[in-house]
Amino acid sequence: VDKSREGPLRDLLLEPCRDPAVIEYRLDVLDDLVGNEALSRCFEDLVPVIGALSYFISRPEHDDWSPFQETVWRLRELEHYAECVKKLDAAFSGGYGKAADGSVADGSAAGEIVLRSDALKRLRALTTRLTADPAFMRLLERLPELLETIDRIKSVTIGVNLNGALQPCEAVLLTVGSKSFTGSGLYDKLIGRDGTHGIAPLHSADTGGFAANPLMVPLFRDLAMVMNRTVQPVAAALKEFVSLNGRMFVRLRDEILFYVGAVRLVRFLNSRGMPMVRPLIEPPGAGRFSVRGLYNIDLAIRFGREADGASLPSRVVGSDL
């Protein structure tokens, strides 16, 4: 689990819900995910996508941000938003991981999946509305072109004049390139280089607090101006998608993480021969508790990770209470 998400998950586990209706609601979701390999895999795949989406949505406000930076951030937000919607749409329609023969990764036939939980039914209905949104359909059409405009910017070429003492005295921005530069190596020196290979090692930026070279200040200003001009068509196109927002997925991230972890746990223990069953919730105040085969789940996890996991039922003994 990402360190930044440990707090919410810890609170959820240390202060468990006691409302029977909510518990049943969540167990329905867990049943659906455990019973559908493709849907649970979709949820796992969504975690890093939503993490990236959150990064581009919750960025700090910068008064000095250029139009180029604002445009790139918004475009990346829409890119990850579209990926979330497409993944969910494929999963709910039974086509997640669909192969050429029409089957999905777990061998089952593609087709709309059967859901029991109200939560996932509502999420499917929401996904259906999002995919039918004309703005979203236009986004899918325009997104490859808009991303290509940004992604092709890989490098800039700078020309530097030297004075009589061979010190840099003047600089000019020459080109914006579609290939990244690389440093030189022995192999490059032996076979020759193309225009993107340097004649010395490639150096990374040092952000250790050193002041910028005065020569670089106007150069960076020119670079910002060029970049702003480059993304002007993209910025204009993005105004069409102002109604699209991925915050709903960011709000779901902690819930998705919880269910992903729960599904992994159930499947892990089941694969080692340990039962995991849905409890029957007694009404509040009933004062009854009955269980058969109760076992120490911490021991089961630790022993189950050993090479001889198949022998787990004989090593972790359950008790009836």
Functional labels for PLM-detected ranges:
Residues 1-165:
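Conserved amphipathic alpha-helical "coupling/scaffold" segments
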Residues 58, 86, 90-93, 163, ...:
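Charged/polar positions within long, soluble alpha-helices
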Residues 67-70, 74, 220, 227, ...:
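Amphipathic alpha-helical coiled-coil segments and their boundaries
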Residues 74-77, 230, 248, 252-255:
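Amphipathic alpha-helix face/heptad-repeat signature
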Residues 150-216:
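Structured, charged N-terminal subsegments at the starts of enzyme catalytic cores
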Residues 208-239:
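Extended, charged coiled-coil "arm/hinge" scaffolds of SMC/Rad50-like chromosome-maintenance ATPases
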Residues 255-321:
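Conserved NTPase motor "head" modules and their coupling/switch loops across ABC/AAA+ ATPases, GTPases
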